[in-house]
Structure formats: C-alpha cells, structure tokens
C-alpha cells in the first residue's frame, strides 16, 4: 500500500517503458503486447484482450 504514496513502481515491462505498483497490473498490461484475444462475443465478431 505504501508504494502508492511514495511513487515506487518496481514492476517494469520488458517490452516498453510501462511500470506499475503490483504484479497483477503488469500481467494485465502484458496482454497488450500479444495478439491473443481471450474474450469473444458469442453474437458478433467483437473480441477483446481484457
């Protein structure tokens, strides 16, 4: 919790300059570097990574 107050962002992306406070946020961000679309609409062609 204190990292939020002090601006510490120890989790850094290896592919861009993104950094964040916790590992789960980094894991979510890493999906932006892939072409995998996990969530697809059953009724149309819409798909999203998140």
UniProtKB/Swiss-Prot annotation:
Among Pfam families, the record links this protein to: zf-C2H2_16
Q: Which GO terms describe its molecular function?
A: DNA binding; zinc ion binding
InterPro entries given in the database record? Znf-C2H2_CTCF, Znf_C2H2_sf, Znf_C2H2_type
- Listed GO CC annotations: nucleus
Q: Which GO terms describe its biological process?
A: regulation of gene expression; segmentation
Cell location = Nucleus
UniProtKB keywords:
Developmental protein, DNA-binding, Gap protein, Metal-binding, Nucleus, Repeat, Zinc, Zinc-finger
Where do the ZnF regions (C2H2-type) fall? 1-5, 11-33, 39-50
Q: Which Gene3D superfamilies match?
A: Classic Zinc Finger
What is the role of the protein in this entry?
Gap class segmentation protein that controls development of head structures.
What family is reported? Belongs to the hunchback C2H2-type zinc-finger protein family.
Q: What is this protein called?
A: Protein hunchback
| Species of origin | Lithobius forficatus
- What's the gene? hb
């Amino acid at each position: 919790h204190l990292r939020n107050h002090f601006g510490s962002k120890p989790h850094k992306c290896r592919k861009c300059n993104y950094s964040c406070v916790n590992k789960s946020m980094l894991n979510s961000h890493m999906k932006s570097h892939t072409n995998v679309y996990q969530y697809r609409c059953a009724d149309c062609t819409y798909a999203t990574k998140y």
